[in-house]
Design a protein with these regions (language model features):
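ASCE P-loop NTPase motor core, strongest for the SF2 helicase catalytic module
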Residues: 78, 83-119, 127-209
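Conserved helicase/translocase motor-coupling segment
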Residues: 2-122, 193-200, 206
């Protein structure tokens, strides 16, 4: 087994390897789609609870709203890409095994290794704990988004150069004020996500095979 961060080659031909989702995989996909519907709904509610949006749905802070929406959409796209790759892994592994049995060498090009996510997860592990084994699942990307980017901090309206804009609300000690409603919305989204079956990443499945 050899690994390389970059690989050059020519004369390569590509063919389609089709994977038919099983009924169980379709059910899991639909469940995650439902969880994202909850996250999207809770995100809109949290933007109102924190003061980014007003009661009518109009925004008081276009930059804050655009940032929250952008992070959500990029997380959603990355998640479903990794989820589908994880579901395709069994078919990929069988093709690799067939090629190896035929005496061929297999080159696997991995677009994302999840290295940055793994580093963040390791940073949360106590230095005294023994790390026996661990695995990353696509839903960890979503949990990371909810923990780090979901809007929970209250905003206040201030006038700057004649324009009303929103900025983070701070308490007397200078700490950011957390909206309890937004915090509850985030917790509900995380709880629903954690109840769903984790699908190991494609890379982990290939390494374990």
């Amino acid at each position: 087994l050899y690994t390389a961060r970059a690989l050059s080659f020519d004369g390569v031909e590509y063919d389609v390897l089709e994977h038919a989702l099983t009924p169980a995989q379709i059910e899991i996909y639909d469940a995650y789609a439902g969880a994202f519907r909850t996250i999207h709904h809770n995100l809109e509610a949290a933007l109102t609870a924190t003061g980014v949006n007003d009661a009518s749905g109009e925004t008081n802070a276009s930059a804050a709203r655009a940032s929250a929406k952008s992070r959500f959409e990029s997380t959603k796209q990355r998640f479903f890409n990794h989820l589908l790759m994880g579901m395709k892994a069994p078919t990929i592994i069988r093709a690799i095994e067939d090629d190896l049995a035929a005496g061929n060498a297999c080159v696997i090009q991995v677009v994302s290794t999840g290295e940055s996510l793994l580093k963040r997860r390791l940073e949360t592990v106590d230095s005294d704990d023994e790390l026996v084994e661990g695995a990353l699942a696509p839903r960890d990307y979503v949990l990371g988004y909810l923990e780090q980017a979901f809007p929970i901090h209250a905003q206040k309206l201030v006038e700057i150069d004649g324009n009303m804009v929103a900025e983070p609300l701070r308490d007397e000690a200078g700490a950011l004020v957390v909206s309890r409603e937004a915090l509850a919305l985030r917790g509900a989204a995380m709880m629903e996500l954690m109840t769903l079956a984790p699908i190991p990443s494609a890379l982990d499945q290939i390494l374990w095979a």
